[in-house]
A protein has these predicted regions:
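N-terminal hydrophobic/helix-forming segments and targeting peptides
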Residues: 1-141
Length: 141
């Protein structure tokens, strides 16, 4: 497995804080290639490999920053609230993936330059709306 393939396997699963199960399972699967994998009551992954070599500790966060859905507007836009250290200055126009029964893709809405008053401000409360190209009824399903 190349370094790029390894990084893709580690970063592809959705693992927003509080919903890390898919990231956790992916990591356990990768580590099982190297030894016996178990977990403790705190959710730590432990790999045991027979031998007399040195022990190592890999200490890292498993979760990622992201958003949680807080509502759907009458026009079908998705209202979201940041989870974790999202820098709201960087999200305008960003593509987001909503994980549900099926993945749904959307783009964080921005005010077009010709409609802007030139005083565009970053969301102070960590909220924004996302256009998924659906009407409200379809978005709710």
């Amino acid at each position: 497995m190349t370094t790029i393939e390894l990084l893709e396997k580690l970063t592809s699963p959705a693992g927003v804080a509080g919903e890390e199960t898919s990231s956790f399972e992916a990591l356990k699967g990768l580590f099982s290639l190297y030894g016996d994998v178990s977990t403790d009551v705190s959710g730590n992954i432990i790999i045991h490999k027979d031998g007399k070599g040195k022990h190592i500790l890999l200490d890292a966060h498993l979760d990622t920053i992201g958003f949680v859905v807080t509502g759907i507007t009458d026009e079908g836009f998705i209202r979201v609230q940041k989870v974790g250290g999202v820098d709201m200055r960087t999200v305008e126009g960003m593509e987001l993936t909503f994980h549900g029964k099926e993945d749904v893709y959307g783009v964080v809405c921005t005010v077009p330059p010709h409609l802007s008053d030139g005083e565009s401000k970053v969301s102070a409360d960590g909220t924004c709306v996302v256009d998924i190209g659906m009407i409200k009824e379809d978005a709710e399903n």
